[in-house]
């Protein structure tokens, strides 16, 4: 086995992101949850069309919607071969102290992580769509592996399915749309969304304010897939 020392982790990603979100609100950021049906490219403004045909004008739009980003980019006229890596996690509420650090077992294809609310067994990959239907045979297989690894007699108290947005080269898309430079893409981070979040935000900030970018940005430029 291999032990990675001095690494960083979080025992509750949801609480971590909620704290960041609350800081955003404290500096007078605004949040509104609405479904967008179209993005209209105007000369001076970007117009977002909502369910009630209400049009909102913006100077810049950042498309950062995970596995749904491909749908939004198509509305604007940019097409990316983005798919979902469907991944599962099982939470065992009474077993959070059974290990002290994340443990990955290669032949199983998932990690065990001690969390605030229990032991999480998470991972595996199903390449497909954003279909929310759970593959119960996959759940049963994971439950069996957990029992083989630990002295766990209970069934998981929570089962969750998530969608990892993935592109053909396994790298994210971060950069300006080729159709309108005021549309900025930031998606496709697959398994590394939380890990790369702050670095990706720094890149987006530099793009917005026309600051100098590192040469490595070419590796994640949206235009790299142009034929």
Q: Which residues does each predicted region cover?
A:
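Active-site catalytic microenvironments for nucleophilic, acid-base chemistry
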Residues: 23, 27, 71, 75, ...
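General beta-strand recognition
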Residues: 47-49, 120, 184-185
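Mid-domain beta-loop-alpha active-site segment that forms a flexible
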Residues: 3-22, 67-68, 138-145, 193, ...
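C-terminal catalytic lobe of FAD-dependent flavoproteins
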Residues: 7, 13, 148-227
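Hydrophobic/aromatic beta-strand patches that form the interior of the parallel beta-sheet core
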Residues: 32, 62, 184-186
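Active-site substrate-recognition segment that forms the wall
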Residues: 56-181
């Amino acid at each position: 086995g291999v032990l990675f020392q001095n690494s960083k982790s979080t025992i509750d990603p949801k609480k971590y992101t909620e704290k960041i979100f609350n800081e955003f609100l404290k500096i007078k950021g605004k949040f509104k949850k609405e479904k967008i049906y179209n993005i209209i490219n105007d000369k001076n403004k970007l117009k977002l069309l909502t369910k009630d045909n209400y049009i909102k004008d913006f100077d810049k739009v950042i498309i950062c919607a995970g596995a749904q980003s491909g749908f939004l980019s198509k509305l604007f006229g940019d097409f990316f071969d983005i798919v979902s890596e469907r991944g599962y996690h099982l939470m065992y509420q009474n077993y959070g102290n059974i290990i002290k650090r994340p443990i990955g077992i290669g032949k199983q294809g998932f990690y065990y992580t001690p969390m605030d609310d229990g032991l999480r067994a998470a991972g595996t990959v199903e390449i497909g769509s954003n279909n929310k239907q759970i593959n119960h045979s996959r759940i049963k297989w994971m439950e069996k592996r957990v029992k083989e690894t630990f002295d766990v007699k209970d069934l998981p108290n929570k089962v969750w399915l998530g969608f990892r947005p993935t592109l053909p080269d396994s790298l994210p898309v971060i950069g300006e749309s080729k159709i309108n430079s005021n549309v900025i893409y930031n998606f496709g981070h697959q398994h590394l969304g939380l890990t790369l979040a702050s670095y990706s935000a720094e890149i987006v900030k530099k793009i917005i304010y026309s600051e100098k970018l590192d040469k490595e940005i070419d590796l994640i430029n949206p235009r790299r897939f142009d034929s």
